[in-house]
């Protein structure tokens, strides 16, 4: 909207998520959603000015392949914005994986407590939605998945057992 990009591409492994996103964003010009594998991006070298990855790389089988692929598809001078979480004892492993020689980390921030505050702020609304729209039998699972207060993920963030990070890289020219 502000920068008038020639194209925007959303990629998801799930064809159902692609269909949902396509239907939800029909009116957005130059935006396409495609099904694909983040560890094997089906784009030419140096295609994108910006790659954004939010809360998904922790699900990848081989995240280092994903980071290599981002490096490959980014144009020189391009930006990679990444936000995700890892167990505290896996952060140093992630740092080694993501610290590629072809880009420079421009921003590196732990945002775990910001995430906890956001979860606190939306807690009541999530609980109300779950109570109104989810069958009683499934409510416990939905509370866990949504990260409400008292859930395992909420407690892990609160106790700093899981670290939530935001990083921005620029590919070297």
Give names to the regions the model predicted.
Residues 8, 33, 48-51, 70:
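Hydrophobic packing within well-folded, soluble alpha/beta domains
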Residues 49-63, 86-88:
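A short SAM/SAH-binding and catalytic strip from SAM-dependent methyltransferases
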Residues 103-114:
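Conserved S-adenosyl-L-methionine
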């Amino acid at each position: 909207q502000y920068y008038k990009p020639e194209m925007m591409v959303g990629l998801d492994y799930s064809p159902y998520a692609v269909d949902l996103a396509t239907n939800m964003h029909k009116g957005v010009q130059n935006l396409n959603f495609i099904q694909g594998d983040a560890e094997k991006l089906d784009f030419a070298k140096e295609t994108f000015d910006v790659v954004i990855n939010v809360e998904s790389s922790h699900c990848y089988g081989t995240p280092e392949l994903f980071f290599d692929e981002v490096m490959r598809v980014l144009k020189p001078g391009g930006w990679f914005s990444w936000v995700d979480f890892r167990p505290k004892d896996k952060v140093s492993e992630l740092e080694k994986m993501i610290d590629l020689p072809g880009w420079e980390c421009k921003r590196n921030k732990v945002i775990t407590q910001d995430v906890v505050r956001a979860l606190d702020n939306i807690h009541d609304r999530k609980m109300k939605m779950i109570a109104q729209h989810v069958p009683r039998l499934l409510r416990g699972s939905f509370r866990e998945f949504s990260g409400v207060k008292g859930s395992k993920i909420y407690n892990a963030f609160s106790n700093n057992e899981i670290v939530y990070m935001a990083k921005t890289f620029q590919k070297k020219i």
